[in-house]
């Protein structure tokens, strides 16, 4: 959806294909910065003040089979493996973690499959299955305070907001907050 126009009782939206649709309610199940971008000039000051508090950082993400991005001792492997960070002294760089998908998602696969965020050295090229960039919320005192204020926006103008950013960033929180929207 692009260019939503909120009215007293309905929301008129221009779809990405140019079609115009009218809705009683719209649920923004996306990052708050994306919701503000969609709302554009129609975002209220209250929406800007509350959901505008959430900032995101990019994370270079690899799905791969390279065991070199895991702890050296296999006995130390867990579902989530904090490897360190990819920063030089005095630099602020993102955390480097590797998820062991076979354990995390109970994959019954003969090859160990991993997801690494922000590795200091990328996986070996022949072991990369996919590379992408994801953004993750950066929690600050302002964003934590804003989480409590999102409830004040729910249903105002027929718009609702939900997502993992309303809690600790986990998918389960996203599901819970989506469910709560449908209970309103």
Feature-to-residue mapping (PLM):
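Mid-domain catalytic core of redox enzymes
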Residues: 2-135
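C-terminal catalytic lobe of FAD-dependent flavoproteins
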Residues: 121-184
């Amino acid at each position: 959806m692009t260019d939503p126009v909120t009215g007293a009782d309905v929301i008129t939206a221009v779809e990405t294909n140019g079609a115009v649709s009218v809705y009683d309610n719209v649920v923004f199940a996306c990052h708050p910065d994306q919701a503000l971008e969609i709302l554009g000039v129609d975002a209220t000051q209250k929406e800007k003040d509350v959901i505008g508090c959430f900032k995101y950082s990019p994370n270079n993400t690899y799905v791969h089979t390279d065991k070199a991005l895991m702890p050296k001792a296999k006995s130390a492997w867990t579902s989530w493996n904090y490897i360190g960070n990819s920063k030089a002294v005095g630099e602020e760089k993102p955390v480097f973690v590797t998820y062991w998908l076979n354990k995390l998602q109970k994959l019954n696969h003969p090859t160990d499959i991993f997801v690494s965020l922000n590795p200091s050295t990328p996986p070996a090229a022949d072991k990369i299955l996919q590379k992408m960039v994801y953004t993750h919320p950066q929690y600050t005192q302002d964003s934590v305070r804003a989480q409590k204020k999102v409830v004040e926006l729910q249903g105002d103008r027929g718009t609702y907001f939900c997502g993992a950013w309303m809690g600790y960033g986990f998918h389960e929180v996203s599901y819970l907050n989506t469910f709560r929207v449908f209970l309103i």
